[in-house]
Amino acid sequence: MIIRSPEPEVKILVDRDPVKTSFEEWARPGHFSRTIAKGPDTTTWIWNLHADAHDFDSHTSDLEEISRKIFSAHFGQLSIIFLWLSGMYFHGARFSNYEAWLSDPTHIGPSAQVVWPIVGQEILNGDVGGGFRGIQITSGFFQIWRASGITSELQLYCTAIGALVFAALMLFAGWFHYHKAAPKLAWFQDVESMLNHHLAGLLGLGSLSWAGHQVHVSLPINQFLNAGVDPKEIPLPHEFILNRDLLAQLYPSFAEGATPFFTLNWSKYAEFLTFRGGLDPVTGGLWLTDIAHHHLAIAILFLIAGHMYKTNWGIGHSLKDILEAHKGPFTGQGHKGLYEILTTSWHAQLSLNLAMLGSLTIVVAHHMYSMPPYPYLATDYGTQLSLFTHHMWIGGFLIVGAAAHAAIFMVRDYDPTTRYNDLLDRVLRHRDAIISHLNWVCIFLGFHSFGLYIHNDTMSALGRPQDMFSDTAIQLQPVFAQWIQNTHTLAPGATAPGATASTSLTWGGGDLVAVGGKVALLPIPLGTADFLVHHIHAFTIHVTVLILLKGVLFARSSRLIPDKANLGFRFPCDGPGRGGTCQVSAWDHVFLGLFWMYNSISVVIFHFSWKMQSDVWGTISDQGVVTHITGGNFAQSSITINGWLRDFLWAQASQVIQSYGSSLSAYGLLFLGAHFVWAFSLMFLFSGRGYWQELIESIVWAHNKLKVAPATQPRALSIVQGRAVGVTHYLLGGIATTWAFFLARIIAVG
């Protein structure tokens, strides 16, 4: 008799055909809500429809159904991303000067859009060099294509078609995993499996395949391009992949194949997996061999990380155990209960992810210029400025989103009865101490940082430069930052014995990399001016955090409104007859936080734009003399408010203001138009609902007189809606104004 061990139970993790596919609901706007589905009585209906269409919490309280909707929506989002990417590659294939740019990237600007000659708009097609007329683009796609080894517009065309196929696939997946095979709640809550797949699959194998592509395709093609070989003469990507001898001609160790890997003789691969540091003097970008090495190392780390968590085989970490073991001497129950929060509240989960991704995006912004990863990126000043600005804005929005969803979690998902003495409960119990201290810090930073500028403005007006805070009078040197710079400068050969240059040229040392007579990067000096503006950064960031954190910590209750949780995430005031309780909802804190986020990011991108033009970007003569765009005026001009207004905003706005009649004229119109959108927002922010309701009623009276009154009763926007419309136009107008100002300036002078 054979004794068999019992067969392990196979878990069924999907439900088959849970929701039938039907287009009928598409014809019923608001089908997800009994109230909205009735159709409009007043114009408020359309606003409620938009506010609640994607608020899956309000459609059902079934967590499994909510999870499936979110999961399906993610596939829809991926589909749109693939569609967008396909459009970018298609523009590169069909409307761009990519092949011309590839042959001479220092003298030809990137362009992938040619405006049709309708009512004189062809003026926008500027001469970007090489006889091509079009709009100069600043997205960095050309540089990334060159780094990936794309040598022809046909390859871009094929990639665009591939992306369309993937877009269709994602749309199908979104439908399939909601209507045909929808995962059960247990599948969404299986965090160990998710970690394994995301770490080992997405990040590990993703990085490994990119490293493989770089070694087998990008490196050889870029080596030929750097040597000046005509792109049409270079072998195609598949030839390098299929024919090892081609690679062995460039990198002799390729002839040995995988033998050095299995015999642990890894130094043989040092030809194409390097650890040099610094920039490639030909392209002004990081060494592509360094980048390949980096992705290989990252892949190994994540492949290991992806095998650390316990799934079907009974070994490995369990996340619940890790969290519950996490107790400090002063933290009570510690992280006990956090596992349950993060597996049942997707708002809590999303909040953490947004905070991390937002911070990471800002880190990306700072690395894109200090360690420019793609060839000829560093000398394309318009693209450098655009990438920095873009990633700063995106990071700011994501971080505010983190606070928004943390507050929604507090209002909708937090259960105070089951939480006692864990970290979150302890934070909530001493929230007054946190917020009052943070408030004190904001007041201190605000008065002192701004006070230094006001002092300088006053001394400047009185003609007493010797009494100003500046590099030539009373110095306030950023000694800590300079010490960090110095430490990194000295690292190669000392604490980083294998590296030949420091991680970034910005740290210091005498090195300067110029490509085609333009500065790519050089050591960035920090002085009193930077010390002053960095404290403005500290101030604006702390105020943003104060507003957002107060919104989260007081989302459920406060001394003013003890039952705030019952009023929900967004509400205008605590009912009629209770004065002084407006703008206290968690939503209002997000609303106010957005303005301070806008403040913070604006100061950062202004600082970056001026500092780079003053101290980094410029031209270099045959004798090695560097001439910066604004001639190093940052250190002495930016130490007064007047200097910022006069020598940055006003002086550098001349290009956008005088752009009419040139190929930059669209930026001039955008500059005006975006100012208008911004000003339009003030109408929503500075007036109350009653004013508009009164106005609407007299307009309705006139319509009734003429017997043209609509069946749907017009209503003024609610207080919350008015604020939402206001902040949207404020941010859109402000961002588009900045965009036009920056680009007209940098394309004209850069």
Curated annotation (Swiss-Prot):
User: How is the cofactor bound here?
Assistant: P700 is a chlorophyll a/chlorophyll a' dimer, A0 is one or more chlorophyll a, A1 is one or both phylloquinones and FX is a shared 4Fe-4S iron-sulfur center.
Annotated chlorophyll a' binding sites: 675
**PROSITE patterns per UniProt:** PHOTOSYSTEM_I_PSAAB
Q: Where in the cell is it found?
A: Plastid, Chloroplast thylakoid membrane
Spell out the reaction equation it catalyses.
reduced [plastocyanin] + hnu + oxidized [2Fe-2S]-[ferredoxin] = oxidized [plastocyanin] + reduced [2Fe-2S]-[ferredoxin]
Binding of chlorophyll a occurs at 683, 691
Membrane topology of this protein: Multi-pass membrane protein
Q: Tell me the keywords, alphabetical order.
A: 4Fe-4S, Chlorophyll, Chloroplast, Chromophore, Electron transport, Iron, Iron-sulfur, Magnesium, Membrane, Metal-binding, Oxidoreductase, Photosynthesis, Photosystem I, Plastid, Thylakoid, Transmembrane, Transmembrane helix, Transport
- Gene Ontology cellular component terms for the protein in this record: chloroplast thylakoid membrane; photosystem I
One GO BP annotation of this record? photosynthesis
Which major enzyme category is it? Answer: oxidoreductase
* Predominant subcellular localization, coarse grouping: plastid
Does the record's keyword annotation contain Lipid biosynthesis? no
Look up the domain of life of the source: Eukaryota
Transmembrane regions:
70-93, 156-179, 195-219, 291-309, 346-369, 385-411, 433-455, 531-549, 589-610, 664-686, 724-744
Record-annotated residues binding phylloquinone?
A: 692
Q: Which SUPFAM superfamilies match?
A: Photosystem I subunits PsaA/PsaB
Q: Which Pfam families match?
A: PsaA_PsaB
Which InterPro entries does the UniProt record give? PSI_PsaA, PSI_PsaA/B, PSI_PsaA/B_CS, PSI_PsaA/B_sf
Q: EC number(s) of the enzyme?
A: 1.97.1.12
Q: What does this protein do?
A: PsaA and PsaB bind P700, the primary electron donor of photosystem I (PSI), as well as the electron acceptors A0, A1 and FX. PSI is a plastocyanin-ferredoxin oxidoreductase, converting photonic excitation into a charge separation, which transfers an electron from the donor P700 chlorophyll pair to the spectroscopically characterized acceptors A0, A1, FX, FA and FB in turn. Oxidized P700 is reduced on the lumenal side of the thylakoid membrane by plastocyanin.
Subunit structure of this entry?
The PsaA/B heterodimer binds the P700 chlorophyll special pair and subsequent electron acceptors. PSI consists of a core antenna complex that captures photons, and an electron transfer chain that converts photonic excitation into a charge separation. The eukaryotic PSI reaction center is composed of at least 11 subunits.
The family assignment reads: Belongs to the PsaA/PsaB family.
Extract the HAMAP family matched here.
Answer: PSI_PsaA
Q: What is this protein called?
A: Photosystem I P700 chlorophyll a apoprotein A1
